[in-house]
Amino acid sequence: METVQSALYLFCFARSNLIGELEGTGVDGQHPLSVFRPFPNLCAVQSEVRLEDFCGATAELRMQDLAWIGPRALRHEAVVEEVMRHSPVLPVRFGTLFSSQERLAEFVDRHGAAISQFLERVANQEEWSVRGLLDRRQAGRALTSASLAAQEAQLAALLPGRRYFEEQRIRAGAEKELSLWLEETRRQVANHLRQQASDFCECPEVPRESPESGIEVVLNWAFLLPKSATPAFRARINQVNEKHAMGGLVLELSGPWPPYRFVPPLSIGATP
């Protein structure tokens, strides 16, 4: 009979004194969750998985199959978020494996100080995501209208033919003006929001809408916020939207999330 090799699947690290025994199963829906407590103040949330599910040629195919990976990724997130309700967490990426409890213990022994420092840093804090959606056509029209209004007195003094060409010149320059406006607006908004945050990072801008819609993601930011600052941060998001929505820019706020974007590099990964 062929022996099925298993591995330890890691969800996150947390404060040992704040986490009891966990109920439920891991990402495979079969193996139970467990808590490994290598130090008095530090624990790892884990479960067993079949090694072949995550390593090897067939595993590479599974990782491209949304029907397979989707429910497991959602379960991963659900476990981390459940732990986060009771303790600060250092979340790890989906599919992080260790070959044995001993290998995980060695990893914690090497990086325990950094993990503990991170847990202390994010205590009573949460990650929030902010995305900026720009309706490029609406923004272009708003800037053109503002430019025409600002130069109305000068335009009114021109002969009709000259005025027409001058208005066309203003419209033609709208795209360049839009780029400059967007760059400056991004800078101002980031500075405005960062005043409430303990940390901030810019993330890759993932397209949301089709190019034909004229709506595009023009900023994708993550903020580490003290829980007490959340109401004021929401208020600042609303202020930005009140100021810029008519000009085509709207911010979307989502969270709270585990602080994935702020985890220090620890070279976490499968260990032979």
Residue ranges of predicted features:
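An interfacial alpha-helical scaffold signature
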Residues: 1-272
